[in-house]
Regions:
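Intrinsic low-complexity, intrinsically disordered terminal tails and linker regions enriched
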Residues: 1-275, 279-547
Length: 547
């Protein structure tokens, strides 16, 4: 084995000629992963009588029976990187055809290394970019990246879908966060290959906590599959929403009848996936009607009963730090099954299980590098805003402020049905007032659909990418400004993507087509420019009036 001197092409192979055998071309995957292809055959996009496209072959590989592809340290990340490069190239080609690019092509052509260096310094100083050409280039780079899965700009596009849902159905009714416990849940261990009898489950049998953690760390595919299985199961059983390719079926769930939902998937520092979801309920009064109804005691009592049934931050035993310390401490409580509804003392089992789970999953402990950050006054504060509001009883005011009973300020609220049945950390809030609804909707559109954490200067990365672009020109593109700028956009997007830090379970979600969003309905983009152009053609006086 020796290193080659030519770069490996990661674009689809060209079709073989009439006198060329498809299997004669060398295959990068067969040579780079001899442990995955021990016979030197069967690599991705290798010659075969029936062509198999790249994404489908990757999905097949990740589901291979011996799990060698999904447990490989680099195979998923390399295939995802190749997929991103191909999407970026197609996206750059689409961007070239936009009318906005036609208008700004010569402005972008005026970019120089000095302008990008100046933009880098401005970004480091926290100042806005002053050069118009650099701003135009960034707009096109971000627009190109928005069509590439896993990028920050692709997540930004989710915001318009959330706002369009609110435009059609009004403000959301519920805000819920679900954080399935992949380290200890027995279902995740089954996906990782453990033999566990769920019908005759015994917590003392099966893998111990060290082995369970190793199973999930070694198999990000199992972690991702478990997460999507759990969220789908919660939506279909507890929420009673069944989504098919042709329709959305909604029954009576724990929250009532759901009109629609929209949730975004995010990964934590150690790679665990969790969901932020907004829920719109059916037959909800308009914001104006709610404002008027909240003035009546009868309506406030109904809202109060709804909150007491579905959102809690207290059960007997969680009065203070001292009372919590007296409760049993079971770190492996998630390695269990929910109470059996057929047991004689089901209600008692539910209450005991809820207390044990709330003790382990819902008590917030502030720690540096987890939630404690420095504010602008150089003071350590909890970014989760603990301690939370304390209330002796659940409350609803005539202004719409509401909350559950909470006696200890470091208890996160929870949804009882999710806590007991999914046996994981969760949070929930019922939205009544306009202020709460606007704040939460803004949070989920700006935070839950936020960009991934980064520790790099975008302008600096673009400057390096531009320098590479100048050093490696394509002779065949010299006479075409469109081709030159398409190549520049592709290279800049690829330079930024190289700086991404994506967790293994999130990469598996993209490769398997599961994505990073749960939504009950589909969305179609509306290009408003087409409507305005049609209006100007039909009513020329509108154009003159605008001028």
């Amino acid at each position: 084995m020796r290193h080659g001197h030519q770069p490996v092409s990661d674009f689809p192979p060209r079709e073989a000629g009439d006198d060329e055998c498809p299997g004669d071309k060398p295959n990068f995957f067969e040579k780079a992963f001899p442990c995955l292809y021990p016979y030197g055959r069967g690599g991705l996009e290798s010659g075969r009588p029936v062509p198999l496209d790249f994404p489908e072959h990757v999905r097949w590989s990740l589901q291979y029976f011996d799990r060698r592809f999904r447990k490989h340290e680099t195979f998923p990340f390399i295939t995802f990187g190749i997929s991103q490069r191909r999407q970026a190239l197609n996206s750059a080609r689409i961007q070239m055809k936009r009318s906005t690019f036609e208008r700004e092509a010569h402005t972008v052509a005026a970019i120089t290394a000095e302008k990008l260096d100046r933009a880098k310094e401005e970004e480091e100083s926290g100042l806005p970019i002053s050069d118009e050409a650099v701003r135009a280039l960034k707009r096109h780079v971000y627009a190109t990246a928005a069509r590439v899965s896993g990028t920050d700009q692709a997540r930004y596009r989710l915001r318009s879908q959330i706002w369009s849902t609110s435009t059609v159905l009004g403000p959301p009714s519920l805000w819920i966060t679900i954080n399935p416990s992949d380290l200890h849940d027995p279902i995740a261990q089954i996906f990782a290959g453990e033999e566990i009898d769920m019908d005759r489950f015994e917590a003392t049998l099966g893998p111990d906590k060290t082995r369970r953690a190793k199973n999930i760390a070694d198999d990000p595919y199992a972690a991702a599959k478990f997460f999507h299985f759990m969220i789908t199961t919660i939506l279909e059983t507890l929420f009673q929403v069944k989504v098919t390719p042709s329709q959305v079926k909604s029954g009576m769930g724990v929250f009532g009848r759901v009109a629609t939902y929209f949730g975004t998937v995010e990964s934590q520092g150690r790679g665990t996936l969790h969901l932020h979801i907004l829920v719109w309920l059916q037959h909800v009064p308009s914001p104006e009607e709610i404002t008027a109804l909240l003035k009546t005691e009868a309506f406030r009592n109904r809202v109060l009963a709804y909150i007491q049934a579905n959102f809690r931050a207290y059960v007997p035993g969680l009065e203070s730090a001292e009372s919590i310390a007296l409760l049993p401490h079971n770190n492996e409580i998630s390695y269990s099954r929910p109470p059996n509804p057929k047991c004689e003392d089901y209600n008692g089992e539910i209450q005991r299980s809820e207390l044990e789970l709330a003790r382990m999953e819902q008590v917030h402990v502030c720690k540096p590098r987890r939630c404690l950050v420095y504010d602008r006054h150089n003071q350590l504060v909890c970014k989760r805003r603990a301690p939370f509001q304390v209330a002796n009883e659940a409350f609803v005011t005539d202004t719409g402020m509401c909350g559950p009973k909470r006696l200890y300020g470091y208890i996160n609220s929870w949804v009882p049905s999710i806590l007991v049945n999914a046996r994981c950390n969760n949070d929930g809030k019922f939205l009544t007032s306009g202020a709460d609804t606007k704040n939460i909707t803004f949070y989920v559109t700006s935070y839950a659909a936020k960009k991934q954490g980064k520790n790099y200067n975008v302008s600096a990365v673009m400057a390096d990418g531009y320098a590479y672009h100048l050093e490696h020109p394509k002779p065949e593109y010299i006479d075409s400004i469109r081709d030159q700028q398409r190549l520049l956009l592709f290279r800049l997007v690829h330079s930024i993507n190289r700086e991404q830090e994506l967790a293994g379970p999130m990469v598996m979600s993209y490769l398997m087509g599961w994505g990073d969003v749960f939504r009950s309905h589909t969305y179609s983009p509306i290009y408003w420019g087409s409507f305005t152009n049609a209006l100007y053609v039909a009513f020329p006086e509108l154009s003159r009036r605008t001028q």
